[in-house]
């Protein structure tokens, strides 16, 4: 087995060495739950990478959205170039779940656009878990949604070994059984082609490698790996396993058993509906279910086959589904990034899914067993955890209640020597004039300012007022799309404008080194946006600049404000003491400004100045070019860039549907 090995141009510094040692020791001693309480910009990802290197366990890193998961995956791939770092998120570029609205008698068909590249990465992730131990999978909450049985996925893999006596046609039938298609002309993922005694297979989890298997009579004579584009042989092997093209594949005997089980449930449910006088619902359910059964019998699957997953995997009613977590070996490590956001998100998934399914079941669109195609309940998620490290600058009440203080590991000192910003409270009387004076002082130094308000109206009025005073200012509200949001952040960094006004700026993940002032208006209005955790996160936006400062405008100091100020001052004191002891002078982080639309420049140059202004009739052509760029970015392991292009494609397609 290849061990985890971190490759980095720097060594752990500041608080990192003690954090790495304490967390690693906790894992080795069998501590089930630990917290890495790391301030913004202290290098938490590097610390976790070093912990993985120390404990040598297969690891799942859970992030609360696709973009963050892509960024983390990219970082871990740089730290672990010799190990398997995989990416597992929802493969839907666009997803409209099946639903029924009784008040208007409206049935909404499931509509989805599957990203083939992400589907490939999901297969690559599950295959890696069966073939090696040095695996890190970075995932979104998609990992708690139903997946097929890991036993079926592993047992149905087609094993090819040099010297084995096996009929070539038998192997071809096995490939069809696991949902590979024969195509001698269009050789792409999930396809195979046959040329005499040579069978070539393009595995489900591969991008640029295919398998060539050569027979001599009934004996496998040679197995080689080759580049499907050039045909160049890149290596030979004695054994290879071809894993199924779908995570929902099942053996023939299991499928027959599942069909009988679905028939039985259908008959039972039809009796119930007819007894209740719901004849329309009964007719609808019978027609839809029998169509699905026919499809499964004929071709092995149907649209919406996941709704029958309980029968296909042989589970009892109410039993939790198989998920990515079941593909991990027993001795695994879970890292929950930004746990104060991710934990509540995991907890909320089940209830939202359940209410939609209940309506579909009640009105005869689905069998009751469809409710068992679901995400894990939070208690089920907890049961599956072996060992976990919660990572956050502001851990939530759930983590803090469960983890004893001795297992809360602080990482306060930044490798750059940067301090948490000074926090000052000023009265609200004359606050706008005071803020204007502060903005002017920052603009003279070529620095940027973030202003956070409580209401949309206040943000809009403040933006207009500052514009009238000649300030280059923009307002970022919740309606701003992902791509435009990225462009706004980029323009702020480049100095196209100097002040960004918003309501919930902390959710944007705005780590902008040029920001030296964060102004919090109405800081004394208690609520979600002015709670201790939110205030600490907002204060952290000024922690990347050596001159970082936070001004809270308030007429009184609330408990949340006091706690946030005390915690910031505590961290700042620790950081100052460390800097004095080691003679470190804080320096603002130097971070290159990346062109967020760089990914689409070749397309944009040939079209409108803003790609989102593309006329509807030209959108299909532009989307086709963008998809090629996205595939190339993913191939280059630049998932952040690929995700940006994906968002542009999504918004263009939404615009076309609207037109």
Curated annotation (Swiss-Prot):
Gene3D superfamilies reported for this sequence: P-loop containing nucleotide triphosphate hydrolases, UVR domain
Every UVR domain range: 620-655
Keyword Cytoplasm recorded: yes
GO biological process: nucleotide-excision repair; SOS response
GO cellular component: cytoplasm; excinuclease repair complex
GO MF annotations, alphabetized: ATP binding; ATP hydrolysis activity; DNA binding; excinuclease ABC activity
Main location, first listed in the record: cytoplasm
Entries under Pfam families matching the protein: Helicase_C, ResIII, UVR, UvrB, UvrB_inter
Keyword terms: ATP-binding, Cytoplasm, DNA damage, DNA excision, DNA repair, Excision nuclease, Nucleotide-binding, SOS response
InterPro entries: Helicase/UvrB_N, Helicase_ATP-bd, Helicase_C-like, P-loop_NTPase, UVR_dom, UVR_dom_sf, UvrB, UvrB_inter
NCBIfam families: PRK05298.1 (NF003673), uvrb (TIGR00631)
Protein function: The UvrABC repair system catalyzes the recognition and processing of DNA lesions. A damage recognition complex composed of 2 UvrA and 2 UvrB subunits scans DNA for abnormalities. Upon binding of the UvrA(2)B(2) complex to a putative damaged site, the DNA wraps around one UvrB monomer. DNA wrap is dependent on ATP binding by UvrB and probably causes local melting of the DNA helix, facilitating insertion of UvrB beta-hairpin between the DNA strands. Then UvrB probes one DNA strand for the presence of a lesion.
UniProt note: domains: The beta-hairpin motif is involved in DNA binding.
Protein name according to UniProt: UvrABC system protein B
Natural source organism: Symbiobacterium thermophilum (strain DSM 24528 / JCM 14929 / IAM 14863 / T)
Gene: uvrB
């Amino acid at each position: 087995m290849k061990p985890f090995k971190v490759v980095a141009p720097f060594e752990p510094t500041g608080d990192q060495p003690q954090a790495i040692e304490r967390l690693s020791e906790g894992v080795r001693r069998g501590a089930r739950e630990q917290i890495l309480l790391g301030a913004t910009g202290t290098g938490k990802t590097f610390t976790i990478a070093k912990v993985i290197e120390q404990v040598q366990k297969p690891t799942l890193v859970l992030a609360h959205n696709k973009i963050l998961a892509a960024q983390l995956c990219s970082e871990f791939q740089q730290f672990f170039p010799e190990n398997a770092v995989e990416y597992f998120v929802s493969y839907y570029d666009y997803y409209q779940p099946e639903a029924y609205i009784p008040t208007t008698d409206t049935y909404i068909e499931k509509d989805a656009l599957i990203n083939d590249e992400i589907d490939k990465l999901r297969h690559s992730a599950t295959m890696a878990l069966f073939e090696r131990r040095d695996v890190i999978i970075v995932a979104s909450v998609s990992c708690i949604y139903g997946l097929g049985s890991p036993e079926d996925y592993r047992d149905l893999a087609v094993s090819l070994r040099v010297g084995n006596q096996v009929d070539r046609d038998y192997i071809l039938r096995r490939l069809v059984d696991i949902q590979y298609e024969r195509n001698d002309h269009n050789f792409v993922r999930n396809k195979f082609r046959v040329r005499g005694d040579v069978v070539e297979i393009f595995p489900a989890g591969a991008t640029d490698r295919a398998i060539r298997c050569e027979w001599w009579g009934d004996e496998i004579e040679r197995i080689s790996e080759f580049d499907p584009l050039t045909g160049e042989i890149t290596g030979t092997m004695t054994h290879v396993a071809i894993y199924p093209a779908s995570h929902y594949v099942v053996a023939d005997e299991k499928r027959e058993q599942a069909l009988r089980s679905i028939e039985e449930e259908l008959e039972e449910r039809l009796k119930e509906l007819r007894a209740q006088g719901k004849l329309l619902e009964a007719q609808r359910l019978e027609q839809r279910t029998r169509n699905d059964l026919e499809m499964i019998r004929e071709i092995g699957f149907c649209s919406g086959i996941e709704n029958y997953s309980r029968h296909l995997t042989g589970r009892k009613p109410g039993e939790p589904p198989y998920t990515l977590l079941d593909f991990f070996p027993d001795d695994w490590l879970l890292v929950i990034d930004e746990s104060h956001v991710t934990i509540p998100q995991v907890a909320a998934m089940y209830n939202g899914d359940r209410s939609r399914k209940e309506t579909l079941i009640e009105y005869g669109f689905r069998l009751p067993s469809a409710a068992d195609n679901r995400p894990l309940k939070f208690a089920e998620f907890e049961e599956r955890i072996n060992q976990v490290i919660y990572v956050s600058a502001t851990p939530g009440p759930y983590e803090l209640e469960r983890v004893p203080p001795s297992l809360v590991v602080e990482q306060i000192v930044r490798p750059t020597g940067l301090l948490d910003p000074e926090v000052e409270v000023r009265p609200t009387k004359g606050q706008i004039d005071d803020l204007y004076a502060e903005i002017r002082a920052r603009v003279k130094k070529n620095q940027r300012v973030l202003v956070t308000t409580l209401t949309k109206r206040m943000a809009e009025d403040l933006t207009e007022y500052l514009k009238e005073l000649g300030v280059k200012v923009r307002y970022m509200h919740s309606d701003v799309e992902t791509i435009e949001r990225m462009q706004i952040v980029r323009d702020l960094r480049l100095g196209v404008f100097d002040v960004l006004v918003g309501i919930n700026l902390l959710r944007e993940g705005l780590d902008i080194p040029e920001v030296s002032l964060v102004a919090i208006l109405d800081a004394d209005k208690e609520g979600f946006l002015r709670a201790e955790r939110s205030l600490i996160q907002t204060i952290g936006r000024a922690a990347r600049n050596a001159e970082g400062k936070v001004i809270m405008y308030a007429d009184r100091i609330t408990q949340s404000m006091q706690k946030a100020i005390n915690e910031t001052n505590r961290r700042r004191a620790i950081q100052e003491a460390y800097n004095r002891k080691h003679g470190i002078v804080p320096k603002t982080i130097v971070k290159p400004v990346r062109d967020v639309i760089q990914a689409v420049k070749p397309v944009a140059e040939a079209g409108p100045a803003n790609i989102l202004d593309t006329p509807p009739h030209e959108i299909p052509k532009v989307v086709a070019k963008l998809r090629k760029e996205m595939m190339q970015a993913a191939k280059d392991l630049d998932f952040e860039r690929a995700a940006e292009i994906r968002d542009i494609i999504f918004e263009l397609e939404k615009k076309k549907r609207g037109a």
